Amino acid sequence: MTILSAITSISKPNKISKSAVSSFGGSTLSMGSNSVACGGCGGGSYGGSSGSGSYSSSGGIAIGLAVSIDLNISATVGAILGGGGSRGSCGCH
C-alpha cells in the first residue's frame, strides 16, 4: 500500500513532498516499536532514512521506494533465518 501511494504521488509533482512524508514517515513510525522484535521492520537503524521527509523531488521518491523495498526484503530474510514463527505478528508488510 505504501508503494502504491508513492507511485501515485509521482504523477502529481506539486504534492510529492506531503505524499512522501505521509506514505513513508507514517508507516515507518507506526512500526518503530516493533523494530527490535522484527529485526528491522521500520524504526531502528532504518527508521531515520526511510521516515525522513527531506526529499521533495521525484528522485527522493525513488530513493524512498528503494529503502522501503529493502526493509521488506530484510524482514523477509530475517523471518526465513529466524524460523518465521515468532515474527508473524510484527506487521512487516
From Swiss-Prot:
Top-level taxon of origin: Eukaryota
Record Pfam families: Coiled
GO biological process: one example: sorocarp development
InterPro entries in the record: HssA/B-like_chaperone, HssA/B-related
Disulfide bonds: none
Family according to the record: Belongs to the hssA/B family.
Protein name as annotated: Protein hssB
UniProt source species: Dictyostelium discoideum
Gene: hssB
